[in-house]
Amino acid sequence: MKSFLLLNGPNLNLLGKRETNIYGENTLEHIEKGLIEIAKKNKVELMTFQSNAEHELVDRIQAGKEEKVSCILFNPGAFTHTSVALRDAILGVDIPLIEIHISNIFNRESLREKSYFSDIAVGIISGFGEQGYKAALELSLIHI
């Protein structure tokens, strides 16, 4: 059975509570439940993990190699623009990556336009709200 790892970075635990005009009204837990149902229907495992701590995300990425994860679906949050450590962790495990952003990072403040992951990702989904998570999972089922 294929397994996929959904990772969410800092502040995504506040979905549904923080800047709902940008990030929507649904919680991360609600989004994850919907994705787990899609995974079950497609006979794949979806593991989920969120952390505000960079080192915990690095550890989870590295554990994915041992678990033989087929693909990482990753919304790095603010780490998108700052984390060489997470980039190196992904390169180190050689697992395909799909980068996800709820908002369009290229249509926001200039500090959000640089991503440390886009050039190593299979694809990027940005600006489609929580539907971007569903699109990432469905596309990974086809392409990975």
Show the residue positions of the predicted features.
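N-terminal small/polar loop signature for handling phosphorylated ligands or for N-terminal nucleophile
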Residues: 51-94
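Extreme N-terminal starter segment of soluble prokaryotic enzymes
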Residues: 1-4
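Glycine- and acidic-residue-enriched helix-capping/strand-helix junction motifs
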Residues: 15-29
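Short beta-strand elements in bilobed, periplasmic/extracellular small-molecule ligand-binding domains
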Residues: 38-49
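Flexible, gly/pro- and Lys/Arg-enriched active-site loops
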Residues: 79, 84-135
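Conserved small/polar residues in nucleotide/adenosyl-binding loops
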Residues: 142-144
